[in-house]
Amino acid sequence: MEQALKQAKIAFDKNEVPVGAVVVDRLHQKIIASTHNNTEEKNNALYHAEIIAINEACNLISSKNLNDYDIYVTLEPCAMCAAAIAHSRLKRLFYGASDSKHGVVESNLRYFNSSACFHRPEIYSGILAEDSGLLMKEFFKRIRTVISSHRMT
């Protein structure tokens, strides 16, 4: 999770929503993908950290199934990312801060408990949640400050 948090800080510095994700090979305890949100730079709403990490991992192992892999994410996944986690069959999901607005693991929809979900990873939440949450709060505080200063001019 520390590596995911490092990625989130990189996103923060790039004015991206500070979410980081890593995919780990469970058997060898090795990170095979380490990324962060990149929606602003790519001008593409699909470039969430989880989607990029899953894509990189699948390309690396030449398989769409990540049964022997775990994903660590600094923020509770949204609907798109939760579906990608299910479709790629990741074994375990570890995430940091809850997302009361868009999170669908435990905060809202509870996607992995729905009949629409055909694969449910083991779920572990609250890992480095305070660090992840503070980074998100600082990011959106900065955004609000920029918006306020533009309104004044």
UniProtKB/Swiss-Prot annotation:
Disulphide bridges, residue numbers: none
Cofactor note: Binds 1 zinc ion per subunit.
Cofactor(s) essential for the protein: Zn(2+)
Provenance organism: Rickettsia conorii (strain ATCC VR-613 / Malish 7)
Protein name: tRNA-specific adenosine deaminase
Superkingdom of source: Bacteria
Lineage: Bacteria, Pseudomonadati, Pseudomonadota, Alphaproteobacteria, Rickettsiales
Catalysis performed (reactions): adenosine(34) in tRNA + H2O + H(+) = inosine(34) in tRNA + NH4(+)
Domain CMP/dCMP-type deaminase: start-end pairs: 1-116
UniProt entry keywords in alphabetical sequence: Hydrolase, Metal-binding, tRNA processing, Zinc
Binding residues for Zn(2+): H48, C78, C81
